[in-house]
Amino acid sequence: PIKALYFGGGTPTALEASDIRKILGAARKNLPLAKDCEITFEGRIHGFSDEKLEACLEGGVNRLSIGVQTFNPETRREMQRLDSPEFIIHRLEELGEHDNLAVVIDLLFGFPGQKGKVWTKDLRIAAELPIDGVDCYQLNVFEKSPLNTRIKSGLCEPAATLAEAADMYAESVEKFSSHPDWHRLTNTHWAKTPLERNLYNRLAKGPSDCLPFGCGAGGKLFGYSWMQERKLAKWSDMVDKGLKPVFVMMKPQEHWTLMRTLASSVESGPFNLREIGGNFNVDIEKPLKPVMEQWIKAGLLEKSGDLYSPTVAGQFWYVTMAQLATEALTMIISKDDSFKADPITQSVYSPNQAEAWLKTINKREE
């Protein structure tokens, strides 16, 4: 049976209540959902009426993922977010009154003008709300995005530098790890109650199958990964003609289940290379030892026995580290020794900023 069903890819709460009922009804009718299936509906507070909420609950939704991003009024106006912090907080308190509904919010760090007290207050508000989970993500400023255009034209402050974003991430770790009501699920996900399981996000990063439905959706099956057609008109036309609306498909690499397991283990950390490799009868501990030693030296990992535990710096770099670990193992298995496991110089971020921040982390830990 299907363990997690996720409605995302944008703002599903923008749908009318009648459409929400239709799509949830179709899913429950046609998909073999587990009795305890996590059914997540993604969206935002703006326009999410009581009628839409009832449609979600009637359709079996047991988890809401709300993109709050920030509670700061100035930052929200700058990002063209319509609802006031007071309204958002009030609505989240109302949503939190539903006993069998996990309410999870996303916070972003790195917005222009968000550093210091602004981010500290965002974390404090989130920690005290009657919700079930919080995700803390770094803001990505894409080259052709409206935000980047505004920054380049001087209409708003620059986004946080990498070093500043890393410090903001570290502050979120300190806030929630020291709070008695919260416990950690992954590097970026925190739970306050047992209602928050975060199943979809954890399963999707590992070797589990993930069936994608809808324009632009991506997933994988038996190691084959693919994406649905991204242009809505073309996707709709292909569906009407009975064609599979596949935009691109990739065949599985050698040892793909091992690679997926390794990546998800590094991302969720701590991890045991001997145990991971043993589950697949492949020795990955010895070939990856130089990589791990370099990361320990860089202040990204700590080792105790067979267990590698990411430091706060390693937790911040987890996506890059997971990617580089699988790339390193792939090249080692294929006898390609050209790989250099340096998560700083090979990342998309500024090497100087990253090195400067890692030095400050090392000093703090000393």
Question: What does each model-identified segment do?
Answer:
Residues P1-V282:
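C-terminal scaffold of the Radical SAM
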Residues A217-E366:
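Charged, E/D/K/R/S-rich low-complexity terminal regions of large eukaryotic assembly subunits
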